[in-house]
Amino acid sequence: IVLGLYIGFPRLNQLRFIARDPILTGILKVSKLPVQSTFRRFVNALHLNVARQMLTIMRTMRERVWAAANVKLEVVTIDTDTTVHTLYGQQMGGRKSYNPKNKGKKSYQPMLTFISETREYIWGGLRNGDRPTGKQIGDHIRDVCAALPPCVKQIYGRADSGFYCREAIEAYEECTARFVISGRKTSRLVEQLRQAEWKPSKKTDAGWECEFRYQPDGWKKDYRFVALRYEKTREEVESEETEQYQLFETSQYKYRVFVTDLTEPIDFVVWFYNQRGGAENLIKEANNDAGLAAHPSGRFDVNGNHFQLAMLAYNLNCWLMLFNRAPQTDATALQHTTL
């Protein structure tokens, strides 16, 4: 099943096309692959804990690959994000929630974290269509940090506004990780922006920038917030007179806000956060090439196990890239590639 996912056949009924492929059967040392019903019975028979066991297996494989490929990263950047898988059947766990491309349809919202330097998937899982809670986000970040190889000494974390919560900050701090998280709109934060002392931003694409200390409701202490302000065009102002839908609602400006424990200048914090766009590309690769969005069953546990099989196939490609680099090439210099 993993080899089928790896070479571009994400659905179990597609394996019949390569049932007698000489390369694949030669690798597996069989005359032909079993029929589709055999694969389906096998996947349905896997118990609920297999998904987490596969994450543990991938952790062990990662450590061995890094050792064999001479990857010695002491500093890593972890990018956490969610994606939306629209469902067209009656799969268990489907919810009508955030789904910008197919509004009103049920979906799953998996949560995934990648290592930016090597593009590896390190932790994640299939989730129902509801937005993740603060506890789920905090537990996920702790699991990510625990899954990193022992050679890693310093962690940097990046996440979008979907992870803007007290539990995420506390989880990063427990792991002694530095972080940058995009802020989410609240009335108090908007008021802080209006009161902030703005200055021209010469090293970013924004017109103005500012920073301030701020303690959101329910947080244990204040943190550093940095913000960029963009002036709206006349068309944007006119189009939003009837519908205000943006991060920070104001008649004249658009804002980008980040909470961070980095001490570097504002332009560096913004540049560092912008690099997490690679995580979205990695999710697209996993969805389109590794079959991540192919859910073979109506049962949530079966789809969760298949999710980890797809990500194992994705990681196999990343690990082969580590072995394929030139002897003196650093792992962080590898070019992005699709399966």
Spans of model-derived segments:
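Short, conserved catalytic/metal-binding motifs centered on acidic residues
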Residues: 1, 15, 33-35, 39, ...
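Active-site-proximal, Lys/Arg-enriched surface segment
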Residues: 40-112
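Short alpha-helical elements
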Residues: 1-72, 123-124, 139-161, 166-177, ...
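An anionic, glycine-rich sequence signature occurring as long contiguous blocks
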Residues: 178-282, 286-288
